[in-house]
A protein has these predicted regions:
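C-terminal accessory region of SF2 helicases/translocases
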Residues: 221, 239, 247-256, 262-441
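Helicase motor core with emphasis on the C-terminal RecA-like subdomain
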Residues: 1-303, 311-318, 343-354, 358
Length: 441
């Protein structure tokens, strides 16, 4: 992002964990008017030093605050991130009438309304009370995308089909997988089949990620085989194809990932290869959501006992010893509790604020119901053309379905893209022969 801004003549910098020693210098440049754009991840708002010592000075001089991927603010959304809720605290402390712009390409009407409501409430808490939130929604039509689905009987058939398909498809692209292990397996098979690819997952270190992204942009590899770790911020205008080996759990997240293709070319191929194991994977990820109340109370009680005894903060590692939760799930839970005001991250770990906290069972049930509805919508997308769709006028067109699910305000009744497999705009190869499948087993 910083490099792209520089090429456009915009002076952009970022503050992150990799350049802490430069924070003072960057702040001085901001105060001197030598920076046009400061890029900060929402996760940075939970860093005690940044939150308490750096942010107040930066917010005071901001002429515009932009929230990208704003759908992450809403727990109605497919990609809720608790750290985004801290943006509300930032907005409440802005000088009067500071403009705020929130952008997203993947929010339906419900998520858009929730984001607007939360932003408005945050502004009203600060000195900018009385300001209204204006919501602008445009079309989601992407005429360069040729969408298709190929249902194959097993994993070996999908691997064999994929190797043959990429081998005959021009250009470079992304192959998305649902898990790290699947990404590694697919990448290994493609390399064995003579296709130049590399794996890109959440376990790939930052320097290697940057190198792999540059390799794809320069077409030094045919594809990156990636999990959702390859997402926000990546831009390759001439990306020629996106293939999903396994379906995402939501049409909204699917639309976001396939939207990386065809930004600067007239035609890009987008193929979904669903698997029978997809639902089990969705259920596993869903089970990693907010824990039951008894597990939350164990952590809160431990922090409160430490506070009452006059002790210091408890690290995440120490808190792991009082709960059966995995580290990643524990950290996610603590972030939600932080946003809710029950705990606070400080130097050395976490501490209780002493404020009462109620387990919002209705909220978590609502989020779970929304998650299951999104899963059913994804299954409906897979079955388009074979059975009626509950979405008005979208049974015979994949892009019309995605636009309908996302509440595209400009979708006209009966509209069809003319580019997907159901519209006759994309021909997909048949199932691979037994020899190819056998080689993939």
């Amino acid at each position: 992002q910083v490099a792209a801004a520089g090429r456009a003549g915009i002076r952009a910098v970022t503050m992150n964990s990799a350049n802490v020693t430069q924070w003072d210098e960057i702040q001085a440049r901001v105060r001197a008017g030598e920076v046009d754009v400061l890029l900060v991840s929402p996760e940075r708002l939970n860093n005690p030093v940044f939150r308490d010592e750096v942010l107040p000075h930066l917010a005071a001089s901001a002429a515009l605050v932009v929230i990208d991927e704003a759908h992450c603010i809403s727990d109605w959304g497919h990609d809720f991130r608790p750290d985004y809720r801290r943006i509300g605290t930032l907005l409440a402390g802005l000088p009067p009438r500071t403009p705020v712009l929130a952008t997203t390409a993947t929010a339906n009407r419900r998520v858009s309304a929730d984001v607007a409501e939360q932003l408005g409430a945050s502004l009203e808490e600060g000195e900018a009370s009385g300001e209204q939130v204006l919501v602008l929604r445009g079309t989601l039509e992407r005429d360069s995308l040729h969408l298709g689905v190929r249902v194959l009987p097993d994993a070996a058939s999908r691997l064999a089909w994929l190797a043959a398909y990429i081998g005959r498809t021009p250009g470079s692209g992304i192959v998305y997988c649902l898990t790290v292990s699947a990404a590694m397996e697919v990448a290994e098979h493609l390399r064995t089949a003579g296709v130049e690819v590399a794996a890109y997952t959440g376990q790939t270190d930052a320097a290697e990620r940057e190198r792999l992204e540059e390799d794809l942009k320069a077409n030094r590899v045919r594809a990156l085989v990636a999990t959702s770790a390859l997402g926000m911020g990546f831009d390759k205008p001439d990306l020629a194809f996106v293939v999903h080996v396994g379906a995402p759990s939501s049409p909204v997240s699917y639309y976001q990932q396939v939207g990386r293709a065809g930004r600067g070319v007239e035609r890009a191929k987008v193929v979904l290869l669903p698997g029978s194991e997809d639902r089990a994977i969705w259920e596993w990820f869903g089970s990693q959501g907010f824990p039951p109340e008894d597990r939350v109370r164990v952590v809160l009680d431990a922090l409160e006992e430490r506070r009452a005894a006059g002790g210091g903060a408890m690290s995440t590692a120490v808190l792991e010893t009082v709960t059966s939760l995995r580290r990643s799930r524990l950290e996610s839970m603590l972030k939600v509790l932080d946003v809710d005001g029950a705990v606070r991250r400080v130097r050395g770990g976490w501490e209780s604020t002493g404020r009462p906290w109620c387990y919002d069972a209705e909220r978590y049930a609502r989020v779970e119901a929304a998650r299951r509805a999104e899963q059913e919508a994804m299954l409906t997308y897979e079955r388009l053309g074979t059975e009626p769709s509950p979405y008005q006028g979208s049974s015979s067109c994949r892009m019309a379905f995605l636009r309908s699910v996302l509440d595209d305000p400009l979708l006209e009744p009966g509209w069809r893209c003319g580019a997907c497999d159901l519209c006759g705009g994309l021909d997909l190869p048949d199932a691979p022969d037994q020899e190819q499948v056998g080689a993939a087993r």
